[in-house]
C-alpha cells in the first residue's frame, strides 16, 4: 500500500521539488524511507484500535495537478474562519499570494510561504533550525509522508518582544480531484506550518481548513510551533472540511521557560478525522491551556490523541475536551499526561466529556496519567452520556418545546469550551460555526 506513494515521491523529487536546498532534500529522503518502513497504521496497533484508516490506505490519492480552481477574494472570505483580517491562503498546500492579504502586519512579523522561507538568508536559517525538528516523522507514518512531500506551507515568525495584536489566519483550502480541478481521481495535499514566536512576543494565530467542493479528498497536515521564553501565543485550529474528506493532522508544540500557549481545537468537518496533538513544556514555569470541541453527525468519525509532556518543573497544563455526537457519529479521545522525573510542582488537569444525542452515537474516552515525580498535582476524568434530563425538564416546564430545550442544552454543553477561548472576536466567529454545526 506504500508503493504508489514511493513512485509519486520519486517523480516529485525529480520535478517539482528539485530546487529545494540540500538539507531539505536530505530530510525528505529520510522521511520517505521511514514511511516505507512504517506503513499505514492498522487497528491492531494500540494507538489506532478505535480508528481504521483503511479508506485512506486502500485508495491511491495523487498530488493535485497544475490546474488551479478559479477563486475570488470573496470566495476566500466566505471559507475563512474569521472572514476578514490578514491571512495566508493555500490551495492544496500551495501558497496563493493573489488570494492572501498581509496588510497591516507590524514590523517584526514575517508571514510567507515555506517555499520562500527555506531558500536563503535569515529566514532560511530559521527554517533549517526548526523545520521537521519537532513533528515525530520518525515514528508516525502520516507525519513521515507529509515531510517527504514537504514543498510549501506557512512560515510565520514573530520576532522577540513583538506584539501581533490582530489575529493572523493561515487558511488551507482543499480541492477534490475531478470535482474542481479536473484531475483524474481523488487527491491528497500535505499542508505544513511552522510558527516561531520568539522571546517575550505576543501573537494570535488561526489555522483553518476548509473544502472548496464536497468530493473525495485527503488532507495530511503537520504543524510545528515554537513558543519562546516568556512569549504568549493563542493558537486556534478550525477544521471544517467536507463530509467526504479525510483529515489527518499532527500538531507539535514546544514551550520554553515562562511561556504560555493557549491551543484551541475545533473539529466540525470530515468523514474521517484524526488529530495527534503533542505539547512539550520544556522550560520551567511554562503554562498550557488546551481546549477542544468536536461536533459530529451522520457517520462522521473523529479521533483526538493528545500528549502533554511535562519535561521541566513548575509547569501547568489544563486540558478540556467536549464532544457532541449525533446520529451514528463516533468520537474518540485519548489524552496522555506525562510528568518526567524531576518535573516537580507540576499542576495538570485533564477532562473529556461526551454528549450522545442518539442511541447509535458512540464515544470512546481514555484519559491517562504517567507520573514519574512525587510532588505533583494531577487529575483526570471523562464522562459519556445522553442529555441532562433534569435540565430538559426545567426548560420544558417553562414552556419550551422539546426541540428548543434539546437545542439549548446541547449548545450550552458546547459553549463550555467556547467560553474558555480567550479572544472575544475569535470566539464570536467560532460560536457561529458551532451553531451552524449543531443546526
Regions found by a protein language model. Name each.
Residues 1-222, 229-232:
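Short, low-to-moderate order helix/coil transition modules at the start of elongated helical scaffolds
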Residues 21, 29, 34-37, 83, ...:
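Generic hydrophobic-segment detector
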Residues 122-400, 414-439:
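Conserved beta-strand/loop scaffold segments within soluble protein domains that form the structured core
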